[in-house]
């Protein structure tokens, strides 16, 4: 199966080239390179430094080397997926996700001992879109937690723990801070996060700054009153700044 979005430009010869690879019959997923056009119209070819068939033990290593720099393993449209594999693990899309829904779907296959064939063939060209502010960061947090479990717990790559500690801490802070943007109460979201003891044990404010650092610190300390004070202080300071900015603008116009 080949999933392609309506605004993508698939290359018709990709199917023929990928399926004629000698090891294509041994793979559950075939992956190719792709062209990415950024917001300025510049086109970059995204590829991997190695090709060939990789097993389920090697897959998380390749995933960590490429995913968080290029997004290579998180896109559907440069991949051919064996239908039988999808059905065997009952992989489904989470329709409630507003960001990274492709990655959420693919991780289900990656965790199911999938054999992946990396090929040099270019599958398609796509245009990058601006990030959506209304994205549910808590959904992203749960997805990153699932990936961390796959890489660290299931595949025993404990060397990746510092990376996920930083990543999960950031998504945790974003989940609380940006909750009002999607109509959620930040304190209710904070309570939900604090109930996850395994997640809270991984949190670290070391590489966070400002209000995000304060949020994670309060969550680790299970201190909701302090969290409420920090959020209220930030909102008050932001409101005061906007008022001063408005007054300065009016003063300039009246001068």
Positions of predicted regions on the chain:
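Catalytic core of nucleotide-sugar-dependent glycosyltransferases
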Residues: 114, 121-129, 134-166, 171-199
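Membrane-interface aromatic/basic loop that binds lipid-linked glycans or pyrophosphate carriers
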Residues: 182-255
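Low-complexity, flexible helical/coil segments
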Residues: 37-41, 63-72, 152-161, 177-181, ...
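Noncatalytic linker/hinge segments flanking ATPase motor cores
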Residues: 45-46, 69-78, 121, 139, ...
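Donor-binding/catalytic cores of nucleotide-activated saccharide
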Residues: 6-119, 124-139
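Short secondary-structure transition/capping segments
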Residues: 74-82, 143-149, 164-174, 200-215, ...
């Amino acid at each position: 199966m080949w999933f392609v979005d309506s605004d993508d430009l698939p290359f018709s010869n990709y199917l023929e080239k990928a399926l004629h690879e000698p090891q294509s019959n041994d793979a559950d997923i075939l992956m190719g390179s792709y062209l990415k056009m950024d917001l300025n119209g510049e086109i970059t070819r995204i590829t991997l430094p190695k090709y060939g068939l990789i097993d389920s033990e090697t897959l998380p290593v390749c995933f960590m080397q490429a995913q968080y720099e290029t997004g290579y393993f998180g896109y559907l449209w440069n991949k051919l997926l064996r239908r039988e594999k999808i059905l065997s693990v009952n992989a489904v899309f989470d329709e409630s996700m507003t960001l990274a829904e492709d990655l959420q779907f693919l991780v289900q296959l990656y965790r199911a001992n999938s054999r992946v064939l990396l090929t040099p063939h270019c599958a398609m060209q796509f245009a990058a879109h601006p990030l959506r502010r209304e994205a549910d960061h808590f959904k992203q947090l749960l997805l990153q937690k699932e990936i961390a479990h796959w890489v660290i717990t299931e595949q025993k790559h404990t060397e990746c723990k510092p990376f996920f500690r930083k990543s999960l801490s950031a998504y945790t802070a974003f989940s609380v801070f940006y909750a009002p943007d999607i109509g959620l109460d930040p304190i209710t979201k904070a309570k939900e996060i604090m109930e996850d003891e395994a997640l809270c044990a991984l949190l670290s404010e070391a590489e966070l700054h400002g209000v995000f650092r304060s949020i994670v610190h309060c969550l680790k300390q299970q201190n909701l009153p302090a969290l409420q004070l920090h959020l209220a202080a930030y909102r008050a300071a932001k409101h005061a700044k906007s008022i001063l900015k408005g007054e300065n603008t009016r003063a300039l116009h009246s001068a």
